[in-house]
């Protein structure tokens, strides 16, 4: 293409993404938009087309972002090129959302006509405003009997401060209002700015590993043009590659000769190493590089850590490969090797949150067929020692001796919880039980409240979300952000089996709840660990002090079965001999800890 053609094409490009709270219907809306623009034949159409992972389809949530190019003939008779970038809505995947928004000029804000605005709707809107996107409100599910579009329209204006007078009333399921949405995108979303003659700048917003073509980078071209055969350079790592193919997604990958300003597509350059394409990096030409990289989004720091160990220790290397491949598509995952006396070799992994952790675990078990044992999740603590040094602890077994500790600080988050009036009491109770500090309470309208609490991250990690959902019948929604570290009275609790410490069961707990927690775990382990030939004491200790104990009784053979009547001293002799044997066994015997026992430590708040 020459310069004029490129400029004309650029004026017809519209890049947008869809943002919404979980379950407000954004994947269905994406399906309807694909149908309306005839991106697919009827035969290829299936529900939630852009959720390509099995896991996404099963759980009905979007995890990875996805990009599609669509052609749309608008009412003004012109052909427009729309790039739809689908985003997840769950709080753990905010970083996926911030990546997709960085590649767009506009966003469709989907709000459920029955439920109104929820916590993540707000969080995502603020992300969109930070990226200076044009926001088009759409009120979805208007065909529901409980829909109240006018109230929701008012809510959008009051809570978010967007002008909702032209908000489209739609039902993605019934296909109502889809055309209006497309027309609004064409009218209101600005065309991409940028110059096709400038040095190349492409933003990598995702990547994928293909065993035949190497790493495939998903890119948005901001300036310049990239063709097959160009030599390109990654600005963060400085590595250079020759482009082997470029193209776009029309959900399927379709090869093109070149990508130019405003295009959203993919680039392959036989990149072998996963670490060479960092998401958020800028690609430029090797011969004529751009002066500086694009302002990528920030690198996210993991909040939750846990150990992953293969059940079969021979598969340690397979687990490393699996983690490396997942890390490629998931820039927020971090891992490093660690060893445990109880579990052998494995990895300490960092995640954004519990859902993220669960999904990575499930993907490893599913896609790579490796059975895993996971240890209790923990957060990063700062430990200040009496000699003036300080250290960072992300694994309870690295906690120093309590005598040497001056104070321990833990990360706190500011949690904004949106909840209907009727459940305010229940939510406050949960937050207080989780050592939360009440900060603020605001009424959004007559029926909904936003509560703000400061809560230690370690309390949210366990099962805060599950409790919140179950105690508010699923109506509460919440969003959190880190606010920094504060001192807390924390102690490390060890579990001893047969007076040997099991390092994988150690955890860090607040001193006030240590006794109860210890008691619960000890009882739970007693149920789960199979009986041995000798008796096994289970103890929960803090430092050298035992706070809870329980004993698994020994199994014993009836050694008196063969004595009919007979002298008591004969029986004594047999019983003493048995006792002697059990004692010897106890001094050398070791106890197998089943996988359920490790899981029990995670789920101990259930009772």
Curated annotation (Swiss-Prot):
What would be one Gene Ontology cellular-component term for the protein? plasma membrane
Instruction: List, alphabetically, the Pfam families matched.
Output: EFG_C (PF00679), GTP_EFTU (PF00009), GTP_EFTU_D2 (PF03144), LepA_C (PF06421)
Keywords, A to Z, come to: Cell membrane, GTP-binding, Hydrolase, Membrane, Nucleotide-binding, Protein biosynthesis
Tell me which SUPFAM superfamilies the record gives. Answer: EF-G C-terminal domain-like, P-loop containing nucleoside triphosphate hydrolases
Q: What class of enzyme is it?
A: hydrolase
User: What's its job?
Assistant: Required for accurate and efficient protein synthesis under certain stress conditions. May act as a fidelity factor of the translation reaction, by catalyzing a one-codon backward translocation of tRNAs on improperly translocated ribosomes. Back-translocation proceeds from a post-translocation (POST) complex to a pre-translocation (PRE) complex, thus giving elongation factor G a second chance to translocate the tRNAs correctly. Binds to ribosomes in a GTP-dependent manner.
Family, similarity comment? Belongs to the TRAFAC class translation factor GTPase superfamily. Classic translation factor GTPase family. LepA subfamily.
Q: What is this protein called?
A: Elongation factor 4
- To which species is this protein native? Bacillus cereus (strain Q1)
């Amino acid at each position: 293409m020459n310069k004029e053609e490129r400029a004309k094409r650029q004026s017809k490009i519209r890049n947008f993404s869809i943002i919404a709270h979980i379950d407000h219907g954004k994947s269905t809306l994406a399906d309807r938009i694909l149908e309306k623009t005839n991106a697919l034949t009827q035969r290829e159409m299936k529900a939630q087309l852009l959720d390509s992972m099995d896991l996404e389809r099963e759980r009905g949530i979007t995890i990875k972002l996805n990009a599609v190019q669509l052609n749309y003939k608008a009412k003004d008779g012109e052909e427009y090129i729309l790039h739809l970038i689908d985003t997840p809505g769950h709080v753990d995947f905010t970083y996926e959302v911030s990546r997709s928004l960085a590649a767009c000029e506009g966003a469709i804000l989907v709000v459920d006509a029955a439920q109104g605005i929820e916590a993540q709707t707000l969080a995502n809107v603020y992300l969109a405003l930070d990226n200076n996107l044009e926001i088009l409100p759409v009120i979805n599910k208007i065909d529901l009997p409980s829909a109240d579009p006018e109230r929701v329209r008012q809510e959008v204006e009051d809570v978010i401060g967007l002008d909702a007078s032209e908000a489209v009333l739609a039902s993605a399921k019934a296909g109502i209002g889809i055309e209006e949405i497309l027309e609004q995108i064409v009218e209101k979303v600005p065309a991409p700015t940028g110059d096709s003659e400038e040095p190349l700048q492409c933003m990598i917003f995702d990547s994928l590993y293909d065993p035949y073509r190497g790493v495939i980078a998903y890119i948005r071209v901001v300036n310049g043009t990239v063709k097959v055969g160009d030599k390109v350079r990654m600005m963060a790592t400085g590595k250079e590659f020759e482009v082997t193919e470029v193209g776009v997604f029309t959900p399927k990958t379709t090869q093109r000769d070149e990508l130019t300003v405003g295009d959203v597509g993919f680039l392959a350059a036989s990149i072998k190493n996963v670490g060479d394409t960092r998401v958020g990096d800028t690609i430029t030409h090797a011969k004529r590089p751009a002066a500086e990289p694009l302002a990528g989004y920030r690198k996210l720091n993991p909040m939750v850590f846990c150990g992953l160990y293969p059940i079969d220790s021979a598969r340690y290397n397979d687990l490393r490969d699996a983690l490396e491949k997942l890390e490629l598509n998931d820039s927020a995952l971090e891992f490093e090797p660690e060893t445990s006396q109880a579990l052998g070799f494995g990895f300490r992994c960092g995640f954004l949150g519990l859902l993220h952790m669960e999904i990575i675990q499930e993907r490893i078990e599913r896609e790579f067929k490796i059975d895993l044992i996971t240890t209790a999740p923990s957060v990063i603590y700062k430990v200040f020692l009496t000699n003036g040094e300080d250290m960072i602890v992300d694994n309870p077994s690295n906690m120093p001796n309590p005598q040497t500790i001056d104070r321990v600080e833990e990360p706190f988050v500011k949690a904004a919880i949106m909840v209907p009036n009727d459940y305010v009491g229940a939510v406050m109770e949960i937050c207080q039980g989780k050592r939360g500090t009440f900060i603020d309470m605001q009424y959004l309208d007559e029926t909904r409240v936003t509560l703000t609490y400061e809560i230690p991250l370690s309390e949210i990690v366990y099962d805060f979300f599950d409790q919140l959902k179950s105690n508010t019948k699923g109506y509460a929604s919440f969003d959190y952000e880190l606010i920094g570290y504060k001192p807390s009275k924390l102690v490390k609790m060890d579990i001893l089996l047969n007076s040997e410490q099991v390092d994988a069961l150690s955890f860090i707990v607040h001193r006030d709840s240590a006794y109860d927690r210890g008691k619960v775990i000890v009882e739970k382990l007693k149920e789960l660990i199979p009986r041995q030939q000798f008796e096994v004491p289970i103890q929960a200790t803090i430092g050298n002090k035992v706070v809870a104990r329980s004993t698994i009784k020994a199994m014993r053979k009836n050694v008196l079965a063969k004595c009919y009547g007979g002298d008591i001293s004969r029986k004594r002799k047999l019983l003493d001999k048995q006792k002697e044997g059990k004692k010897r066994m106890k001094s050398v015997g070791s106890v197998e800890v089943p996988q359920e026992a490790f899981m029990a430590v995670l789920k101990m708040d259930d009772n």
